[in-house]
Design a protein with these regions (language model features):
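Residues embedded in well-ordered beta-strands
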Residues: 52, 195, 277, 336-338
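Short, structured beta-strand segments at or near domain termini in extracellular proteins/domains
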Residues: 332-343
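Functional-site microenvironments in short loops/helix caps that host divalent-cation chemistry
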Residues: 143-319
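Short, polar loop/linker segments at the starts of domains and inter-domain junctions
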Residues: 61-87, 254-263, 315-331
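Bacterial Sec-dependent N-terminal signal peptides
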Residues: 2-4, 14-15, 19, 24-51
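A short glycine-rich, aromatic-capped structural motif
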Residues: 46-117, 135-153, 205, 273
Length: 343
């Protein structure tokens, strides 16, 4: 098992650090156990999925002072100058959701007694004939949030499902073809179920860099520079991108089995390249307002996608690059997702 990387601000004293280490390890173990136990007995062996724990943090934004792929705002991520983001502790998947895991949950979810409905069945990798260990693709954002509820229902019970009809109506969402309901979906972050990461959670995890290599300081934490792929030790237009990402220069125009490239400091794979990843947030301009656990724009149609894809140039696979897509209409063979959850 890959060793967890531990958050270690320079000012932390030894007794506090020991408590923090124990808390992080406990969170990781709890989330992993939840994703690896069926909750239903009967000798069922679930498809494994591992998480990395991310402790709470305060991230004061800063402007890049180094070369960037372009001057556009979409290269600059969410931790911009003048903005401070406070994040609660969470866990995030070490890999993109594979087709094997997707299909296992999908087949359970669509049984009449479980009542879930999807717009798309998903496929194995970019071709549809790939390995089951490649990321699932051809799924909309709507499909993903309904699948997250189904996975939670299957593994933890329906009560822990995150995605509900509204803040005042706790009905669990189960139908990805109900565009209006999905568009109005409410994320109950008090629940322990599986969900999409918020954009800030995604970027924080993608940029985690605790040995200060190719990183900038944001308060008490160090984050990979905006101009680099996740886990890369140099900027986008160097061979380092090939070490951590599948993209246009090395992918052969297709997805690949998860976790074949070097992981980042949190032990996360393919945060850059391979498949684009849906996030929870509505897409919109990032403002300098300080926020706690931000969830994106308050209005708008498109949802955020991050990380770039196997067909993109290196510049689109940087940790600061932001993308977006239609949540009910975008389901192509370059787009998948990974999971997050609260401890």
């Amino acid at each position: 098992m890959k060793q967890k990387q531990i958050f270690k601000p320079a000012s932390v004293k030894t007794p506090f650090l020991c408590v923090l280490v124990l808390a992080v390890l406990f969170t990781a173990a709890a989330c992993k156990q939840s994703a690896g136990s069926s909750g239903g007995g009967g000798g069922y062996t679930p498809v494994p999925y591992e998480f990395a724990a991310v402790p709470a943090g305060v991230i004061p934004g800063t402007a890049p002072t180094y070369p960037m792929p372009g001057a556009q705002d979409f290269y600059k991520g969410v931790f911009i100058a003048g903005r401070t983001v406070t994040l609660s502790a969470y866990s995030i998947g070490k890999t993109e959701v594979t087709y094997n895991l997707w299909k296992d949950v999908y087949d359970w979810a669509v049984q009449p007694e479980n009542g879930y409905r999807f717009a798309n069945a998903g496929q194995a990798g970019s071709s549809g004939n790939g390995s089951g260990s490649e990321p699932v693709t051809k799924v909309t954002w709507n499909d993903c949030i309904i699948w997250c509820n189904a996975y939670t229902h299957k593994m933890k019970g329906e009560a822990e499902c995150v995605y509900r009809k509204s803040s005042s109506d706790s009905t669990v969402l189960k139908n990805a073809t109900d565009t209006a309901a999905c568009n109005a979906a409410y994320a109950d972050m008090a629940k322990k179920g599986f969900r999409l990461p918020t954009e800030a959670e995604w970027e924080y995890a993608a940029r985690w860099e605790n040995d200060h290599t190719n990183a900038e300081q944001y308060g008490s934490v160090w984050l990979t520079k905006l101009n680099s792929a996740s886990g890369a030790k140099d900027k986008w237009d160097t061979n380092e991108t090939k070490e951590v990402a599948w993209y246009s220069a090395n992918s052969g125009s297709k997805t690949h089995t998860a976790a074949q490239k070097r992981a980042n400091a949190l032990g996360l794979y393919d945060m850059s390249g391979n498949a684009y990843e849906w996030c929870w947030d509505r897409h919109g301009a990032i403002t300098a307002d300080s926020e706690t656990d931000p969830q994106g724009a308050s209005s708008g149609t498109n949802r955020v996608k991050r990380g770039g894809r196997y067909s993109d140039p290196d510049s689109a696979c940087t940790v600061g690059s932001r993308g977006n897509g239609n949540p009910g209409g975008t389901s192509d063979n370059t787009l998948g997702f990974r999971l997050a959850c609260r401890p």
